[in-house]
Amino acid sequence: MAELTISADDIQNAIEEYVSSFTADTFREEVGTVVDVGDSIAHVEGLPSVMTQELLEFPGGILGVALNLDEHNVGAVILGDFENIKEGQKVKRTGDVLSVPVGEAFMGRVVNPLGQPIDGRGDIEAEARRALELQAPSVVQRQSVKEPLQTGIKAIDAMTPIGRGQRQLVIGDRKTGKTAVCVDTILNQRQNWESGDPKRQVRCVYVAIGQKGTTIASVRRALEEGGAMDYTTIVAALASDSAGFKWLAPYTGSAIAQHWMYDGKHVLIVFDDLTKQAEAYRAISLLLRRPPGREAYPGDVFYLHSRLLERCAKLADHLGGGSLTGLPIIETKANDISAYIPTNVISITDGQCFLETDLFNQGVRPAINVGVSVSRVGGAAQIKAMKEVAGSLRLDLSQYRELEAFAAFASDLDATSKAQLERGARLVELLKQPQYQPMPVEEQVISLFLGTGGHLDSVPVGDVRRFETELLDHIRVAQEEILTEIRESQKLTDEAADSLTEVIKSFKKGFAATGGASVVPNEHVAALDEEKLDKESVKVHQAIPAKTSEKSKNSTPR
């Protein structure tokens, strides 16, 4: 058996050397204690150095956000299941302000307000992390909104156009089609995405706040069937989630979108809906014992929405020229747009589309009330062809609504009023559009050219939509060059208008109304109608000559 060659002195020297070279890793950890917990709110003692909006770690890996920094304790919102958090448990500071992962890999995914995937498709490889509370672009970092963002909805693109970088509010009662308008807008970006041109491509973020799981699933299914999930991210805070998740969801979606905007990309974000976020923030504030204001909302509820929506912008060219377009949704009660939250958001945004219950029930869908809806960007966000054909549309519809109310009580109407009523009824029918069927802008121009140009006056109201559909099918097959010219030049030249008029006239000859009657106007009847209209206008505008009597002739002036 071999003898040991290591002596006791060698062992002693090795131990002494190791002990002398050992340096203990010491770190300072600030730990607090849960004083009370309930309704997703916890009060914690013993964290004197905590920052506002800092993440706190509760037992079991559950996170919370420090909101109230009081003298003796910290009020924190728990993000997740608070049932297992008990009084006396330890809480650790993380040293990190609330942030979420961002990057290209988020397209096509469904995440929660912490940026964690919830679609069962594995982890997401993030490019970076972005803080939720960041300063919005300043005045010098912005430029004016001048590029159109087509929604594919005729009534919006014609009368309340939206530009890239704009904030357009979609407001109305429940079940009036607010979500449908925004989903159609996302679907309409597919053609731009498939073009492969970064200047045309628009990435989309859909933020669902307090929605039912089935509602979010149906939206996702509609986007998948329309080929829109390739460029869309869904941030979901379910109705069953805590108030903290509903409060944070819009900021998470905005952070993901801002990452692309500052990278020079164009982004569209939908907040569905901010009413539920305000209600969640009200619940959090009341539980934290913050003083309530109007309708029990806290005093900073305006700032809650303004600092979110101010992030939507069209960046200056030296910052890449990216844009973030916002479509916030607000739900009203009994069409009351003068309530607290609706008026707040109306004052923050650049316009609103007001959807009305009565119009929706009459079958006018999208149920946009033209009189109340407005876009403060206006013609700057429209192509020239759309300006030409839709210039008089809002006025025509407003006059039609006034005459319609008057005609309900008047038995006898002059020819001009009857013509306006007939034209208005056809315009209303023309602006109706099925859900999930957005229309390219060049086809919208042709459709509106039909209505405002009077080409539908001889078509029965019940056949207007069929006439429009069949004419567009005919043009796609036989007159593709008209669509191509409008799409590429973005203008409707006199030559294009003349050729389009000839196409419509020839198409009318082969089109039969529901009863089998021809829609080609009789030239003789049309001339008589024109003469009748002229006479009516003469009656209105011509001065009536004063009748002079013999007595007046002989009388001398004083």
Swiss-Prot record:
Pfam families per the UniProt record, alphabetical: ATP-synt_ab, ATP-synt_ab_C, ATP-synt_ab_N
E.C. no: 7.1.2.2
Record-linked SUPFAM superfamilies: C-terminal domain of alpha and beta subunits of F1 ATP synthase (SSF47917), N-terminal domain of alpha and beta subunits of F1 ATP synthase (SSF50615), P-loop containing nucleoside triphosphate hydrolases (SSF52540)
Signal sequence bounds: none
Membrane topology: Peripheral membrane protein
Biased composition (Basic and acidic residues): 548-558
Gene Ontology molecular function: any one: ATP binding
Keywords, ordered alphabetically: ATP synthesis, ATP-binding, Cell membrane, CF(1), Hydrogen ion transport, Ion transport, Membrane, Nucleotide-binding, Translocase, Transport
Region (Disordered): 536-558
GO cellular component annotations of the record: plasma membrane; proton-transporting ATP synthase complex
Site keyed Required for activity: positions: 373
Family: Belongs to the ATPase alpha/beta chains family.
HAMAP family: ATP_synth_alpha_bact
Function: Produces ATP from ADP in the presence of a proton gradient across the membrane. The alpha chain is a regulatory subunit.
Binding partners and assembly: F-type ATPases have 2 components, CF(1) - the catalytic core - and CF(0) - the membrane proton channel. CF(1) has five subunits: alpha(3), beta(3), gamma(1), delta(1), epsilon(1). CF(0) has three main subunits: a(1), b(2) and c(9-12). The alpha and beta chains form an alternating ring which encloses part of the gamma chain. CF(1) is attached to CF(0) by a central stalk formed by the gamma and epsilon chains, while a peripheral stalk is formed by the delta and b chains.
Protein name from the UniProt record: ATP synthase subunit alpha
Organism listed in the record: Mycobacterium leprae (strain TN)
